[in-house]
Design a protein with these regions (language model features):
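Eukaryotic intrinsically disordered, low-complexity segments enriched for acidic and Ser/Thr/Pro residues
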Residues: 1-214, 218, 250
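TPR-repeat structural position
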Residues: 233-234
């Protein structure tokens, strides 16, 4: 792991905001990109600090990156946990469909494959292309979306929201922001728990022959930097203070 120190510093310098991945199933990103990016930074995001207490973050720096982007696709599995702070905190799945049979036979199976990874926090945005003056298209879009909700929402969690390409309303944006923040918060909680467990495991080795400060440093600073990027500054400073203390005692 010591070999990753230089790489860690390089990655850290280029990771000044959290990543929201975009899974563009129906080639819609160019149609909605400007509208989505106007929602950034994420406003009034309620996150949990290290003590699991809610903290309101007024402005959370974030960027949308497509899953086909080389910045995501080039990452190796063995690096994922070391540099977990730079992995996407949410995945927005963009879809559209204008036919119920097509939804059942093509789109639904494809979506099932995409979202079956339980490690990833995701939600689906159904983009309706129906013009308000076209009653038939509008009714079909509503039917397809209702089927989407029935198949992917659960009693515990709603995973779908509907974007009207000809003029999304405030209700959609409130729903979109809420689902995005839920994903970010859940991802952050999981990663904090992982880093804490790993750091605890390494701390137990401090006074043994296998102790390696470099390993501990990368994991501890990764946690500190993740707090820093998500604007949980008190937690970040606390991690850096603990890291400095550990170094002075090594």
């Amino acid at each position: 792991m010591a070999n990753y120190l230089a790489q860690f510093q390089t990655i850290k310098s280029s990771s000044d905001r959290i990543v929201i991945a975009v899974e563009d199933v129906s080639d819609l990103w160019l149609n909605v990109k400007d509208s989505f990016e106007q929602r950034l930074p994420v406003k009034k995001a309620c996150l949990n600090n290290k003590a699991r207490n809610p903290v309101l973050v007024e402005n959370l720096p974030a960027e949308f990156i497509q899953t086909t982007d080389s910045r995501l696709r080039s990452r190796f599995p063995q690096e994922q946990y070391l540099f977990w702070f730079r992995e996407p905190y949410a995945t927005v799945v963009l879809v559209t469909c204008e036919d119920l049979d097509e939804f059942k036979t093509i789109l639904k199976p494809r979506l099932k494959l995409i979202v079956q990874n339980d490690e990833r926090e995701w939600f689906i945005v159904f983009v309706s292309k129906a013009h308000p003056s076209n009653d038939q298209a509008t009714k079909m879009a509503k039917k397809v979306y209702a089927r989407l909700e029935a198949d992917f929402n659960t009693k515990k969690r709603e995973r779908c929201c509907k974007f009207d390409l000809h003029g999304p309303d405030d209700e959609f944006w409130d729903d979109f922001d809420s689902k995005m923040v839920d994903c970010i918060r859940n991802t952050l909680d999981k990663r904090v728990q992982f880093y804490e467990e790993e750091n605890r495991r390494l701390s137990e080795q401090r006074f043994t022959p296998i102790w390696n400060f470099c390993n501990f440093f990368i994991l501890k600073e990764s946690l500190a930097f993740m707090f820093e990027v998500t604007n949980l500054h008190e937690d970040s400073l606390r991690e850096y203070d603990e890291l400095e203390l550990c170094y002075s005692e090594s």
